[in-house]
């Protein structure tokens, strides 16, 4: 952190690369067990694909594509996994809305609009562990037989969008994304959609209408 920055030094500060800024994190609580944020704030962790794979990344995707889709939905139900919005809606229940034999195209949308002022729960993941988000989406796509997915990100978050775009290209280069992923005979693409900054688009139906 930079302290006592005077107006005349502002131009110097703007020249410092963002990667050189380090925000200190408090030590974890003795009873804390991080899951989603287990890689957030680590000095030895970077956002590139190689680092993610070294830390166990995409292992769960490999496991998922070896399982029957219905078994994945049942496992998610049993886990009690919930959405990270205010409602905390059970993920497995939402997945169950899709019929196993659905003939119409099904699309997956990740709501990364995060329009609540002062909320950073999504941006932490996007900026510091983007491949975790992508892997979760790919597992969801496999479980629901979805071939096209979107990440709807707020227009005011251009850096986050760029990070996700780079991560998607890395994943595609390693065959985690695109045609016949991991030799499973399954095609899936993820697209970034930048919103226009409307607050209402953080709500599910408003987001879908905007998209």
Where are these regions (language model features)?
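Feature of Fe-S/electron-transfer and energy-metabolism proteins
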Residues: 1-211
């Amino acid at each position: 952190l930079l302290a006592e920055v005077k107006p005349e030094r502002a131009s110097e500060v703007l020249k410092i690369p963002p990667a050189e800024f380090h925000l200190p994190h408090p030590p974890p609580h003795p009873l804390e067990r991080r899951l989603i944020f287990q890689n957030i704030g680590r000095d030895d962790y970077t956002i590139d694909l190689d680092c993610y794979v070294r830390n166990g990344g995409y292992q769960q995707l490999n496991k998922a594509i070896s399982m029957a889709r219905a078994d994945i939905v049942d496992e998610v139900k049993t886990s009690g996994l919930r959405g990270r919005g205010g409602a905390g809606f059970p993920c497995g229940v939402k997945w169950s809305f899709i019929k196993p034999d659905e003939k119409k195209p099904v699309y997956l949308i990740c709501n990364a609009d995060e329009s609540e002022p002062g909320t950073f729960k999504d941006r932490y993941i996007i900026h510091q562990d983007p491949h975790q988000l992508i892997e979760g989406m790919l597992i969801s796509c496999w479980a629901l037989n979805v071939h096209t997915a979107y990440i709807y990100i707020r227009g005011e978050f251009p850096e986050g969008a760029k990070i996700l775009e780079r991560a998607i290209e890395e994943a595609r280069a390693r065959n985690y994304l695109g045609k016949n992923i991991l030799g499973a005979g399954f095609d899936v693409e993820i697209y970034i959609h930048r919103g226009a900054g409307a607050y209402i688009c953080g709500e599910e139906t408003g987001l879908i209408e905007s998209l």
